[in-house]
Amino acid sequence: MYRALYAFRSAEPNAMAFAAGETFLVLERSSTHWWLAARARSGETGYVPPAYLHRLQGMEQDVLQAIDRAIEAVHNTAMRDGGKYSLEQRGVLQKLIHHRKETLSRRGTSASSATVMTPSTSDHHLDAAVSRQPNGVCRTGFERQHSLPSSEHLGTDGALYQVPPQPRRAAPTTPPPPVKRRDREALVISGSGGRTAIPSGGSSVSSGSSASSTSMDTLYTGSSPSELGPSCSPTPPPVPRRGAHTTVSQPQPSPSKAPSPEPPTEEVAAETNSTPDDLEAQDALSPETTEEKAAAETVVPRTIGAELMELVRRNTGLSHELCRVAIGVVVGHIQATVPASSPIMEQVLLSLVEGKDLSTALPSGQVCHDQQRLEVIFADLARRKDDAQQRSWALYEDEDVIRCYLEELLHILTDADPEVCKKMCKRSDFESVLALVAYYQMEHRASLRLLLLKCFGAMCSLDAAIISTLVSSVLPVELARDMQTDTQDHQKLCYSALVLAMVFSMGEAVPYAHYEHLGTPFAQFLLSIVEDGLPMDTTEQLPDLCMNLLLALNLHLTAPEQNVIMAALSRHTNVKIFSEKLLLLLNRGDDPVRIFRHEPQPPHSVLKFLQDVFSSSATAAIFYHTDMMALIDITVRQIADLSPGDKLRMEYLSLMHAVVRSTPYLQHRHRLSDLQATLRRILTEEEASPQCQMDRMIVQEMYKEFPDLGEVPS
């Protein structure tokens, strides 16, 4: 990386004008007096005089950024020309990519050895990068076009780019220098022993003796008064010209043996007489100040993740989780593809992970769009509920408007940030949720009721507190009444059973007044649907939904002797299909009622139901003999297979205890030896966890009540 000490402007073709302080990336040292360079700021390429440049150390990251900008400039120019690359553009790309590889390798070597590369070493690598070009020769023509075409040039190696295929062609050993004006002897070397004049007419250095790049950086002094920069010497060197005759310079000793020339007296005087403004300008160009400015500019606000989520969701309609995935994929790809942006992209990813709640993660003053829409929808639906005309014929004129509101509400509850939805539902002691329940009770149009049921189901998935509110509301009573009175609408009947199972899925206590509609008659109605079905139920979904509803409804009934479902079960003459479905669920180990992951988790609904069934001999008789044997097989196997400390093992032990107590198990003794061996193993377990202690207590109680279980088989 080089910085311009002086401003430069020339009428020569292919020469690049620049101001003092600009930084460059040297691509090729074409000759002693002209280097092919790329402007670090824009990626523009052209020939510059090395006498005007000063080498900067320890800026590999800036070099990589400059290379990437130059590559991008070449590709963009080619895209504007129809996607075709000229030979000159291919040559520039080749040099840029090779230089990038060398820079990455040098940075890796420097990091591993923890040493700083000296200027001579850096120059050696730069020269080696030039000498190891794939075509082995320097390209001719002015390589001014630049920048990056998208993915076709992304590679898998460290360079990340791949040069498009190009035909080989012969090239002169020296690049085309600026056109000759006149010969001049202009460059003066100020050494410790005196002055030596060197012809500047584009003389080429012989292969046997070339000046080192270290001495080249300090070789020329002076500046033109008309183009003098604030931190530059008053007299820059004259512009190098290519003369009509090429002059071979005299052999010079190698850089390691020759002493470095002293700085010219003019430059020393200029540095001594520098004004405070000049010193401030020099400080502004220092690498340390540049790095500090860059660090200050790359501070990523902590709200960037939430802002991106809001923008993507609002403009694409993707769900909250898909928005997070999309942003993470894009930011991660940028981080991997553009290494210079890695620190910034990492902060963006962290902000994306930390910003869980959009309503609080957004900058102060900004409100989440979904939150705004929920406020509008809840307020308008509440207004329509309280409308004095809602019981008149005019109510039916607003069906389309209400349907649009409910569809948008369902979309937001399903796809928006769950934290935002929970916040809006819990506002003012669940006022909005209770208003929707009251509106459902008043609304008789089937299409709107169906949308309301879907919204209630989406609300149940948000938080357990919303389920508690719905259990205590009039919704369960209204759903039970609606299911028994309107059995013709199959779709609404299915959704009513599903939502009611969701409401009862947490096993919370139901208000006593609800049993007027949720008592034994309702349980018998559900059992009849499971056993006999309904004529319009061609998909056979309704029996399974009613089965799940019975299991969920049984969760909050703690006393078996007062269990309305067990009472209905004992009165039902035939529950063959119900018992088979129950046995199938037990064999699978599934709990169809555990729909959500809310805490605290309720008991296993299938095991709880079977324990209540075998709490009485009247209900235990619903199983046929073969089904009973299969149930014992499953229970004994689960007790033997489950690990110590597993809560389910205690549930299966309690079930087996109830089976032995309420059925003639000791008469047929099915799988008795396996059961005895498992019970003995449980008693000898040394685990001290509360679950293991409870398991041992159940086994001891079984031995005490049924001594035959403790007998050692002969």
Swiss-Prot record:
<keyword id="KW-0728">SH3 domain</keyword>
<feature type="modified residue" description="Phosphoserine">
    <location>
        <position position="286"/>
    </location>
</feature>
<dbReference type="GO" id="GO:0005654">
    <property type="term" value="C:nucleoplasm"/>
</dbReference>
<dbReference type="GO" id="GO:0017124">
    <property type="term" value="F:SH3 domain binding"/>
</dbReference>
<feature type="modified residue" description="Phosphoserine">
    <location>
        <position position="260"/>
    </location>
</feature>
<comment type="subunit">
    <text>Associates with the intermediate filaments, vimentin and desmin. Binds the first and third SH3 domains of NCK. Binds the proline-rich domains of N-WASP through its SH3 domain. Similarly, binds diaphanous protein homolog 1 (DRF1). Binds the SH3 domains of GRB2 through its proline-rich domains. Interacts with FASLG.</text>
</comment>
<dbReference type="GO" id="GO:0098978">
    <property type="term" value="C:glutamatergic synapse"/>
</dbReference>
<dbReference type="GO" id="GO:0098794">
    <property type="term" value="C:postsynapse"/>
</dbReference>
<feature type="compositionally biased region" description="Pro residues">
    <location>
        <begin position="252"/>
        <end position="263"/>
    </location>
</feature>
<dbReference type="InterPro" id="IPR018556">
    <property type="entry name" value="SPIN90/Ldb17_LRD"/>
</dbReference>
<feature type="compositionally biased region" description="Polar residues">
    <location>
        <begin position="106"/>
        <end position="121"/>
    </location>
</feature>
<feature type="modified residue" description="Phosphothreonine">
    <location>
        <position position="174"/>
    </location>
</feature>
<feature type="domain" description="SH3">
    <location>
        <begin position="1"/>
        <end position="58"/>
    </location>
</feature>
<keyword id="KW-0597">Phosphoprotein</keyword>
<feature type="compositionally biased region" description="Polar residues">
    <location>
        <begin position="216"/>
        <end position="226"/>
    </location>
</feature>
<feature type="region of interest" description="Disordered">
    <location>
        <begin position="139"/>
        <end position="298"/>
    </location>
</feature>
<dbReference type="InterPro" id="IPR036028">
    <property type="entry name" value="SH3-like_dom_sf"/>
</dbReference>
<dbReference type="InterPro" id="IPR035514">
    <property type="entry name" value="SPIN90_SH3"/>
</dbReference>
<dbReference type="GO" id="GO:0008180">
    <property type="term" value="C:COP9 signalosome"/>
</dbReference>
<dbReference type="Pfam" id="PF09431">
    <property type="entry name" value="SPIN90_LRD"/>
</dbReference>
<dbReference type="GO" id="GO:0010976">
    <property type="term" value="P:positive regulation of neuron projection development"/>
</dbReference>
<dbReference type="InterPro" id="IPR030125">
    <property type="entry name" value="SPIN90/Ldb17"/>
</dbReference>
<keyword id="KW-0539">Nucleus</keyword>
<keyword id="KW-0729">SH3-binding</keyword>
<feature type="compositionally biased region" description="Low complexity">
    <location>
        <begin position="200"/>
        <end position="215"/>
    </location>
</feature>
<dbReference type="GO" id="GO:0005886">
    <property type="term" value="C:plasma membrane"/>
</dbReference>
<feature type="modified residue" description="Phosphoserine">
    <location>
        <position position="673"/>
    </location>
</feature>
<feature type="modified residue" description="Phosphoserine">
    <location>
        <position position="120"/>
    </location>
</feature>
<feature type="region of interest" description="Disordered">
    <location>
        <begin position="103"/>
        <end position="126"/>
    </location>
</feature>
<dbReference type="GO" id="GO:0150052">
    <property type="term" value="P:regulation of postsynapse assembly"/>
</dbReference>
<comment type="function">
    <text>Has an important role in stress fiber formation induced by active diaphanous protein homolog 1 (DRF1). Induces microspike formation, in vivo. In vitro, stimulates N-WASP-induced ARP2/3 complex activation in the absence of CDC42. May play an important role in the maintenance of sarcomere and/or in the assembly of myofibrils into sarcomeres. Implicated in regulation of actin polymerization and cell adhesion.</text>
</comment>
<feature type="short sequence motif" description="Nuclear localization signal">
    <location>
        <begin position="168"/>
        <end position="185"/>
    </location>
</feature>
<dbReference type="InterPro" id="IPR001452">
    <property type="entry name" value="SH3_domain"/>
</dbReference>
<dbReference type="Pfam" id="PF00018">
    <property type="entry name" value="SH3_1"/>
</dbReference>
<protein>
    <recommendedName>
        <fullName>NCK-interacting protein with SH3 domain</fullName>
    </recommendedName>
</protein>
